Amino acid sequence: MPQGETFHRAVSNVLFISQIYGLLPVSNVRALDVADIRFRWCSPRILYSLLIGILNLSEFGAVINYVIKVTINFHTSSTLSLYIVCLLEHLFFWRLAIQWPRIMRTWHGVEQLFLRVPYRFYGEYRIKRRIYIVFTIVMSSALVEHCLLLGNSFHLSNMERTQCKINVTYFESIYKWERPHLYMILPYHFWMLPILEWVNQTIAYPRSFTDCFIMCIGIGLAARFHQLYRRIAAVHRKVMPAVFWTEVREHYLALKRLVHLLDAAIAPLVLLAFGNNMSFICFQLFNSFKNIGVDFLVMLAFWYSLGFAVVRTLLTIFVASSINDYERKIVTALRDVPSRAWSIEVQRFSEQLGNDTTALSGSGFFYLTRSLVLAMGTTIITYELMISDVINQGSIRQKTQYCREY
């Protein structure tokens, strides 16, 4: 690992891209020195993020108005939840931005322990490359999903226009299909479409980026636990002096405090992200028993969106759970310490390792460990069995009519 490969330098470009969508409005996010990172209430980034928040909040108000005037059903409630989740994600990233300068300075201080001898010999984790790979894969897949859903909307709006003989232009039909809540209060103008698409992206981007951000945090923390484990594994079954175990234990406690600091800061984001992912997966599974459509594009967009949500959730768990995985490896390594080398320091270290779970959590409701996969899988299978029993599959027919009532 290069001597200067800190988490801040590895993740700075990713955070800069997120600021394009109004997330984490921190000044000097790409600064070489963490001391230069600032959160200023009167800054262009804050004003830009505030503008995006106002636009999203205004559209949320239009959605509420639409739901009240039309009806509350399964579909409109999912639209409401989408905007609520989006607004909460922006709010939680604002909350995190206020704490981010302090977090980065604390993180940088802990990292200095692992950027010098002997840890530099155990540093092939390559934080930056891993973060870039995760970000590229997740956000590229999210872009494909967004394009498929847009293409799906274009197709369905055109089918509605032609089948139902609606006397509107092609682009107005898209506006009517994509934004029925705005169509009720704002007449169509072509110049509105690029603005609405940009607002749409600021709503869609945080859903995937939040998972990506959690993975980036997990990679940064796991890299240091990996170094600590490698140092302990290097002295496997060797007799080491007490000063060695004292130093290793103190470094572990520094990492543990850092995990607790990060967990307190991003726990609301973790809870929101996994709650949203689970509800979306269950919603799509429910829709899979209902009318999806006979068109290839409709089917492709539906199943890709569902598959992407499942894979993204699993990837987030596996990446973030690597923190806990390395701690468990350290526990295993301590069990192999020879009895003649066992000391008070090793005993204290062993007890501190077993005190509690070292992992990111969703505000204490769950921890990002590998066992979470089994828990979520069991929940989804139970839900699938329940709805398959409730819904009469014999009455399901493929959707061939696209006319909607407003």
Swiss-Prot record:
Tissue specificity remark: Expressed in Gr5a-expressing sugar-sensing cells.
Keywords: Cell membrane, Glycoprotein, Membrane, Receptor, Transducer, Transmembrane, Transmembrane helix
Glycan-linked positions: N167
Subcellular compartments: Cell membrane
Transmembrane segments: 48-68, 80-100, 131-151, 184-204, 266-286, 291-311, 371-391
Physiological role: One of the few identified sugar gustatory receptors identified so far and which promotes the starvation-induced increase of feeding motivation.
Name the record gives this protein: Gustatory receptor for sugar taste 64b
